Amino acid sequence: MAQTLNRSLTDLGALLHLVDPTLPIGGFNHSNGLETFVQQRVVESKATLEEYVQTQLLQNWIYNDGAYLSLAFDAMNEGNFDRLCELDWQLSATKVARESREGSFKLGVRLLKIFIRYETHTLLTAYQQAIAEKRVQGYFPIVFAMVAQAMGLTKADTLYAFYYNAAVGAITNGVKLIPLSQMDGQDILFDLRGSLVQAVELSLDPDEEWLGAATLANDIRAMQHEVLYTRLYMS
C-alpha cells in the first residue's frame, strides 16, 4: 500500500512540475492570436472569452497540438525515434502562422533543456541532438509528450495536463487583455472541467486524417498579430 501511494504521489509531483506556470520557458509571452481577437473586439467579455477557449479546445487543439502530443506519446512507448522526427516535421507544416510556429519550438527547446537534466532516456538525448543538428525543431507538444512518457506518466493524465495548461494560459491572457476580473477567469476555468475531459477522450486515439484541421479565424488572427501597431505578446 505504501509503495503504491509513494508511486502515485511521485507521478503527481512529476505532473505538477511539468505544468508548473513558473517554469522558465516563456509561455506567458504568447497569446497565439488571442491578442488580435481582443483588439478587434471579437473577444471582449467573459462570455466571448469562454467561447474562444472552448472553441480552441474542441475545434483546434484536439486536431493539432493535442493530437500530435498523443501520437508522440505512442512513438515514445514504441521507442520509435524516426516517428518522433516525422511528427515534428508534420507539425511544422501545419503551424501556418510564423509567430505561433516559432513560439512553439522555442517553448519546446526550453522545456527539454530543463527536464533532460532529470530524466535519463535515450530518446530525449537523441531528440536534443537532432535539435542541435537542425534535423528537427523541437515543438512544444512533442517535447511535452516525450518528457511525460519518460517520467512514467499515463497518456490520459498527460493530455489532461497539457490541455489544462493551455486553457489556463489562454484564460490568463484574456483576463489581462480585455480586461476581466480574476474571479471571471476562475469561473471560466471551472466551467471547462467537462470539456477538458471530453478533449482528452477525443485525443487518446486521434484520427490522422484530421491532423492539422484548423480554425481559420484563429490562424488569420495569429498572422495579423505580426503587424499589430501595439502588442503585449510575442504571438
UniProtKB/Swiss-Prot annotation:
Protein species of origin: Haemophilus influenzae (strain PittEE)
Function description: Required for maturation of urease via the functional incorporation of the urease nickel metallocenter.
Gene Ontology terms for molecular function: nickel cation binding
Keywords from the named record: Chaperone, Cytoplasm, Nickel insertion
Gene name of the record: ureF
Location within or outside the cell: Cytoplasm
Highest taxon in the source lineage: Bacteria
Ranges in a coiled coil: none
InterPro entries: UreF, UreF_sf
Oligomeric and partner information: UreD, UreF and UreG form a complex that acts as a GTP-hydrolysis-dependent molecular chaperone, activating the urease apoprotein by helping to assemble the nickel containing metallocenter of UreC. The UreE protein probably delivers the nickel.
Family listed: Belongs to the UreF family.
Gene Ontology, cellular component aspect: cytoplasm
Name of the protein: Urease accessory protein UreF
